Amino acid sequence: MLIVTTNEIPGYRIDEILGSVWGLTVRSRNIVSQFGAGLKSIFGGELRGMTTVLIDSRNQAMQRLVEEATARGANAILAMRFDTSEIGGMWTEICAYGTAARVSRLNS
């Protein structure tokens, strides 16, 4: 699966646009890590536990994005983006989205 943040892929022709696809995950924050993050924010520095959760969440959202595009018969995702939002102060939503497409390599 080719995944790009652009609307086109150099060296490829877009044969068919299959529509919008997305992968979503919502994660709750652990009370202990929230407390630790609160203390860390007072003194400064990276919130490693939260960073790890966000990396894992983005990876899961990407995996779900690819699964949906594959189910539609796509071999590429164009204009891929991430959106992150907080829900109720306790959950983090991560959404990966883009346009599923069938592409083919141009003759050189």
Swiss-Prot record:
Cysteines paired by S-S bonds: none
TM stretches of this protein: none
Annotated InterPro entries: UPF0145_dom_sf, UPF0145_YbjQ-like
Domain of life, per lineage: Bacteria
Entry similarity comment: Belongs to the UPF0145 family.
Protein name: UPF0145 protein Acel_2109
Species per Swiss-Prot/TrEMBL record: Acidothermus cellulolyticus (strain ATCC 43068 / DSM 8971 / 11B)
Phylogenetic lineage: Bacteria, Bacillati, Actinomycetota, Actinomycetes, Acidothermales
